[in-house]
């Protein structure tokens, strides 16, 4: 019984087990993969030694995570592009609430002042005019 030839779908990539590049790897690529695996194993061993240390004091700091967080917080401009949409949203979120609160307070005071001038508002505890 013969199986039909595998045809990759347009929506999903070729599985790694069927990829010929998975098995035809150059020695340099294999060496680089082995070095990365050794570094990963060494870092994992150091972390586990720190994690399982019974005399541990404080937190275990991950230097890669610290570098990543520092780069994200201090290096904003390579990751941010000012566009008209960003500018408009910044203005709306920055000035929109201030204008809205000003409008509410102003209309409420104007309405109250109009009722006071017409004499329709009962001001039992008023201290001014």
Swiss-Prot record:
Residue ranges for the region (Disordered) are: 1-26
Q: Where does the record place the modification N-acetylserine?
A: 2
Q: What Pfam families has UniProt attached to this entry?
A: NDUF_B4
The topology of this chain with respect to the membrane is: Single-pass membrane protein
Recorded GO cellular component terms are: mitochondrial inner membrane; respiratory chain complex I
InterPro entries given in the database record = NADH_UbQ_OxRdtase_NDUFB4_su
Localization per record: Mitochondrion inner membrane
Residues bearing the modification Phosphoserine: 26
- Primary location recorded for the protein, binned into one broad class: mitochondrion
**Protein family (similarity comment):** Belongs to the complex I NDUFB4 subunit family.
Protein name stated in the entry = NADH dehydrogenase [ubiquinone] 1 beta subcomplex subunit 4
The species this protein was found in: Pongo abelii (Sumatran orangutan)
Question: Which gene codes for it?
Answer: NDUFB4
């Amino acid at each position: 019984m013969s199986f039909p030839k595998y045809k990759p779908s347009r929506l999903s990539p070729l599985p790694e087990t069927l990829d010929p590049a998975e098995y035809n790897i150059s020695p340099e690529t294999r060496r680089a993969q082995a070095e990365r695996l050794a570094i990963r194993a060494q870092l994992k061993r150091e972390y586990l030694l720190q994690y399982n240390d019974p005399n541990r004091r404080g937190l275990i700091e991950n230097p890669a995570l610290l570098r990543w967080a520092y780069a994200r917080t201090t290096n904003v401009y390579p990751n941010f592009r000012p566009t008209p949409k960003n500018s408009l949203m910044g203005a709306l979120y920055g000035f929109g609430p201030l204008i809205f609160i000003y409008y509410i307070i102003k209309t409420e005071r104007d309405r109250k002042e109009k009722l006071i001038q017409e004499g329709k508002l009962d001001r039992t505890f008023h201290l001014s005019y």
